[in-house]
C-alpha cells in the first residue's frame, strides 16, 4: 500500500510545483520598479513607454511594438530588449543586464499568459509590490551624506538625522551617536516626531522608483507602518499639534491625510499640479498649509479638506511653509530667494521679509523667531513681530545648509548641511553649542 502512494506523490508533486504561476505583483512588478521605472515612469518617459502601472507596461511605446504579448515571446518587444546581446538594444540602458533568474521570470510570465493578479491594473506598481526590506546601511560612510532632514525628540534630549538607508540618532549633550534605525529607503527627506507617542515618521524612498513614509518606534527602531506608497519619493510629513492627524506629501502631487493612532488613510487632496514640498499645521490643528513646486502655497480647512486660499506670490518652487503661531498668517519661502508673510483671509502678501536669500531650503519657527536656511553658509533669523532680520548664525558650515529643526523645550536650533555637518545653536545667546559630522564612523567633533 505504501509504494503506490509514494509513486503517485512522485508524479503529483512536480505538477503542483509547476502549477504555481509567476505572479506579476510579487515577481515582475518589483523588477520593473527597481530596474525600469526611473527611465520609464511618470517623471521620465523614454521611448514614449511607461511601466509604472500594469496597463501602461502592456502598451506599445514609440516603436509601436507591443511590450508583452501573452504566450508569445517572439512578439514581446520588452522581452527582446531584456535579452538583446547588443548593448544599444538591451534594457536597462547603460546598466548591467538583468540577472538570468529575473529574465527567466519574465519568460515564464509571458509564456503563462502575462496575466495581472492584482485588483486594479491602472494602480501604481509601487502600491502593488509586497512590503520590502531595504538594504542594510553601510557600517560607515565613505563620504559625507547630505543632511536632508532633522527632528528633535519632544524633550530635546536627542536629535534624529537623515542618513543613507537609515536614520541616525545623536545626543544633544555632546554630539555622540546613540543608535541607528535601519530598514529605511535610500534617502530620507523629512522627519516628523509625534508630540506624545514614541512614533517617528520618516518620508523618502528611492528617487524615480519608490516613495513611501515609514513609521518607526523612535526608541526601539521597530517598523510600525508603511504609508503613502508611490512611484517617486515622499518629500514631507507633519503631525498635527494634537497628534491625531498625519499629513504626507510627495512627488506625485497628492497630499494624504492619515488618522492616528491606526494610521488610516482618510483623505487625499489633489489641488496641486506638481510636487508637494512642504506641509505645516496651524496652532489649533484645523488648517493645513502646503508648499509646492507649482510655485503656489495653499491652505486647507480640515476635516473635509476644503481649499480656503491659494498664494501665488512666488516666482519659483515653494519649498518651506509655516503657520504663524498667533495670527492667521503664513510664512512661505521659495527657490527664488523670497521669504513672504501673507494673510490667509485674502491670500495677499503682508510683507516680504527677504528677497535676497539665493536658494532657500528650509524654515523653522519658534514663538518669537523665524529661521531660514539657504545656499548660503549662514542661518538668517527674523523677528515674528516686526519681520526684521535680527541675527545671522554663522559657524562651521562650509556648504549649503539644507535642513533645520527647532527645539522649543530648550530654545535650540539644529541645522544640517550638504557636507553632513550638524550644528546645534542656543537661540538665547545666539551661539554655537557644538557641531559634529553625522557619519557613524566619525562621532568626534570636526
Language model: regions and residue ranges:
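Hydrophobic beta-strand positions that form the internal "hydrophobic ladder"
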Residues: 159, 200, 246, 288, ...
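WD40/WD-repeat beta-propeller blade N-cap
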Residues: 140-147, 182-188, 228-234, 270-276, ...
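Conserved strand-to-loop turn within each blade of WD40 beta-propeller repeats
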Residues: 162-164, 203-209, 249-252, 291-294, ...
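WD40-repeat beta-propellers
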Residues: 150, 167-171, 211-216, 255-258, ...
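Aromatic- and Gly/Pro-enriched helix-to-coil junctions and flexible linker segments
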Residues: 17-148, 152-157, 163-164
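Residue-level detector of Asp-centered blade-edge/turn motifs that repeat once per structural unit
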Residues: 154-155, 195-196, 241-242, 283-284, ...
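Short loop/turn segments that connect beta-strands within beta-propeller blades
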Residues: 172-175, 217-221, 260-263, 302-305, ...
Amino acid at each position: 500500500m505504501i509504494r503506490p502512494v509514494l509513486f503517485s506523490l512522485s508524479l503529483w508533486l512536480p505538477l503542483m510545483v509547476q502549477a504555481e504561476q509567476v505572479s506579476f505583483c510579487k515577481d515582475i512588478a518589483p523588477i520593473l520598479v527597481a530596474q525600469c521605472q526611473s527611465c520609464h515612469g511618470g517623471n521620465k518617459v523614454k521611448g514614449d513607454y511607461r511601466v509604472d502601472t500594469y496597463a501602461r507596461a502592456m502598451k506599445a511605446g514609440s516603436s509601436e511594438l507591443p511590450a508583452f504579448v501573452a504566450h508569445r515571446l517572439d512578439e514581446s518587444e520588452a522581452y527582446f530588449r531584456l535579452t538583446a546581446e547588443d548593448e544599444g538594444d538591451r534594457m536597462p540602458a547603460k546598466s548591467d543586464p538583468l540577472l538570468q533568474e529575473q529574465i527567466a521570470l519574465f519568460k515564464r510570465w509571458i509564456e503563462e499568459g502575462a496575466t495581472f493578479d492584482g485588483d486594479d491594473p491602472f494602480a501604481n506598481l509601487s502600491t502593488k509590490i509586497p512590503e520590502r526590506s531595504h538594504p542594510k546601511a553601510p557600517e560607515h560612510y565613505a563620504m559625507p551624506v547630505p543632511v536632508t532632514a532633522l527632528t528633535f525628540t519632544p524633550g530635546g534630549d536627542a536629535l534624529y538625522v537623515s542618513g543613507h538607508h537609515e536614520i541616525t540618532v545623536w545626543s544633544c549633550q555632546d554630539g555622540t551617536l546613540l543608535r541607528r534605525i535601519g530598514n529605511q529607503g535610500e534617502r530620507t527627506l523629512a522627519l516628523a516626531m509625534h508630540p506624545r507617542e514614541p512614533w517617528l515618521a520618516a518620508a523618502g524612498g528611492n528617487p524615480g522608483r519608490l516613495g513611501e513614509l515609514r513609521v518607526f518606534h523612535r526608541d526601539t527602531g521597530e517598523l510600525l507602518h508603511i504609508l503613502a506608497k508611490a512611484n517617486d519619493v515622499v518629500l514631507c510629513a507633519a503631525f498635527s499639534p494634537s497628534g491625531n492627524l498625519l499629513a504626507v506629501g510627495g512627488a506625485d502631487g497628492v497630499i494624504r491625510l492619515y488618522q492616528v493612532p491606526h494610521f488610516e488613510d482618510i483623505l487625499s487632496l489633489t489641488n496641486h499640479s506638481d510636487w508637494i514640498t512642504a506641509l505645516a499645521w496651524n496652532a489649533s490643528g484645523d488648517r493645513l498649509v502646503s508648499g509646492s513646486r507649482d510655485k503656489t502655497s495653499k491652505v486647507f480647512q480640515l476635516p473635509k479638506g476644503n481649499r480656503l486660499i491659494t498664494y501665488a506670490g512666488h516666482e519659483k518652487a515653494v519649498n518651506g511653509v509655516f503657520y504663524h503661531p498667533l495670527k492667521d498668517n503664513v510664512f512661505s519661502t521659495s527657490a527664488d530667494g523670497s521669504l513672504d508673510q501673507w494673510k490667509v483671509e485674502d491670500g495677499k502678501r503682508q510683507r516680504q521679509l527677504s528677497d535676497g536669500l539665493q536658494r532657500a531650503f528650509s524654515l523653522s519657527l519658534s514663538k518669537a523667531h523665524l529661521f531660514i536656511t539657504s545656499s548660503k553658509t549662514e542661518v538668517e533669523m527674523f523677528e515674528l513681530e516686526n519681520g526684521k532680520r535680527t541675527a545671522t548664525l554663522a559657524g562651521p558650515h562650509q556648504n549649503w545648509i539644507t535642513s533645520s529643526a527647532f527645539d522649543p523645550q530648550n530654545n535650540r536650533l539644529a541645522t544640517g548641511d550638504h557636507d553632513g555637518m550638524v550644528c546645534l545653536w542656543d537661540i538665547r545667546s545666539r551661539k554655537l553649542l557644538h557641531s559634529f559630522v553625522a557619519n557613524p564612523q566619525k562621532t568626534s567633533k570636526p
